[in-house]
């Protein structure tokens, strides 16, 4: 089967654009670290250009790297729907679903698609190769490795289904560095000297995070029939069993018993590499029924980055009730907009939210209900927490910090 491997190049980000956000000293530090790497080629490979945090990061990171003299490129592998069904199974298994079984047919399809894609991208010609997530991880098997290869894992790998992990591990171990969001995601069999801990980031200048005028926010709310005069609870996430969407609906219903006017916004993108998302999307609609105070807002009806931005800014409370979460970029986005987030105490969320200071960490839906009611009844506390949340993002989770960490890794590999 022939695949059309696509190369993506978007935006014209420049490091200087971020000076007002990160300060001149930080800009100079990054420029200094980039000096030895100027003219070097650095290629990223993943499985989708749209939907999900990896694609969002790359849309900003690739042009930003180019602005400091690094020849950054980004390729997206292709495959049939069956391949993405298999890799979604991988995703679920690696995040801890023990009921899933790895068949010989799944292995064969996974390897065949990686092999076919390897014929259309000459990755051996780059100075540094960075492969994102399990989908293209086996690419390393099909090249003569002439330069450092890095594997970036964006999922919660703290307790994987062992059968799937053992299969994937044989490829991961061939990489020169493996990058994880948190130390607990590094499996014990891996060489700790090769492991790097690095949280992902957001781009404050992207359509999803840039400042919006209040008039634009109100126009967007009106377009999607959201009442700005009534309290708004929002969760932004894929339609995925791991995102805890049914818990969010339950939280909203219990809050509504106390505050009848409350509205719930379920905001999400239907991503191209997530066939399972369509099934869960339909289940979500059935769960909601005919409650017109719940809005399901997706790219299918014209919700794109700027609209998501407006919904987050208009919200009184942001939830992230994921059951597993490698690192919740939507949590960081909301925090950057000065919103305290109520999140389940799992994965990267535990690291993002400082409990009681920049938001609340909860164990279950009942705890979340208490915290939602508290924030709705104490807007001054909410505002204070939101200000601290924004500052935490500025110091730790901005795209320029992300890029700086990559520069450190490349320099350590002999840049």
UniProtKB/Swiss-Prot annotation:
One of its GO terms (biological process) is glucose metabolic process. Its cofactor is Mg(2+). Keywords: Carbohydrate metabolism, Glucose metabolism, Glycosyltransferase, Magnesium, Transferase. Not thermostable. Approximately 25% of maximum activity remains after 1 hour incubation at 55 degrees Celsius. It catalyses: an NDP-alpha-D-glucose + D-glucose = alpha,alpha-trehalose + a ribonucleoside 5'-diphosphate + H(+). Optimum pH is 5.5. Stable from pH 5 to pH 8. Its EC number is 2.4.1.245. The keyword Plastid does not apply. It holds the Pfam family TreT_GT1. Homodimer. Belongs to the glycosyltransferase group 1 family. Glycosyltransferase 4 subfamily. This is Trehalose synthase. It comes from Pyrococcus horikoshii (strain ATCC 700860 / DSM 12428 / JCM 9974 / NBRC 100139 / OT-3). The lineage of its organism: Archaea, Methanobacteriati, Methanobacteriota, Thermococci, Thermococcales.
């Amino acid at each position: 089967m022939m695949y059309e491997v696509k190369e993506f190049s978007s935006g014209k980000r420049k490091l200087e654009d971020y000076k007002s956000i990160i300060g001149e000293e930080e800009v100079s530090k990054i420029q200094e670290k980039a000096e030895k790497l100027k003219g070097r080629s650095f290629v990223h490979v993943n499985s989708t250009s749209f939907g999900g945090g990896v694609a969002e990061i790359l849309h900003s990171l690739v042009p930003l790297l180019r602005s400091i003299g690094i020849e950054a490129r980004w390729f997206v592998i292709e495959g049939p729907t069956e391949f993405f069904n298999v890799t979604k199974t991988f995703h679920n298994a690696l995040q801890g679903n023990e009921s899933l079984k790895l068949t010989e047919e799944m292995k064969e399809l996974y390897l065949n698609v990686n092999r076919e894609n390897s014929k259309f991208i000459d990755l051996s010609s780059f100075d540094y190769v960075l492969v994102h997530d399990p989908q293209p991880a086996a690419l390393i098997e099909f090249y003569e490795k002439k330069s450092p290869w890095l594997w970036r894992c964006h999922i919660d790998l703290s307790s994987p289904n062992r059968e799937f992990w053992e299969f994937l591990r044989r490829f991961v171990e061939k990489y020169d560095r493996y990058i994880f969001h948190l130390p607990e995601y590094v499996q014990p069999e891996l060489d700790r000297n090769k492991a790097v801990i690095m949280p992902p980031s957001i781009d404050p200048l992207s359509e999803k995070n840039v400042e919006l005028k209040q008039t634009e926010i109100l126009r967007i709310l009106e377009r999607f029939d959201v009442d700005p005069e009534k309290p708004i609870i929002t969760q932004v996430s894929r339609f995925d069993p791991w995102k805890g969407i049914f818990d969010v609906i339950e939280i909203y219903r219990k809050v509504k018993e106390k505050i009848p006017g409350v509205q719930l916004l379920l905001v999400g993108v239907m991503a191209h590499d997530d066939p399972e998302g369509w099934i869960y999307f339909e289940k979500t609609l059935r769960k909601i029924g005919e409650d017109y105070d719940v809005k399901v807002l997706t790219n299918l009806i014209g919700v794109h980055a700027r609209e998501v931005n407006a919904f987050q800014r208009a919200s009184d409370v942001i939830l992230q009730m994921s059951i597993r979460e490698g690192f919740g970029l939507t949590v960081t986005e909301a925090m950057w907009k000065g919103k305290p987030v109520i999140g389940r105490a799992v994965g990267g969320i535990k690291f993002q939210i400082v409990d009681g200071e920049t938001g609340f960490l909860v164990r279950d839906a009942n705890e979340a209900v208490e915290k939602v009611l508290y924030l709705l009844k104490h807007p001054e506390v909410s505002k204070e927490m939101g200000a601290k949340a924004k500052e935490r993002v500025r110091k730790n989770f901005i795209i320029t910090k992300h890029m700086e960490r990559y520069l450190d890794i490349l320099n350590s590999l002999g840049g």
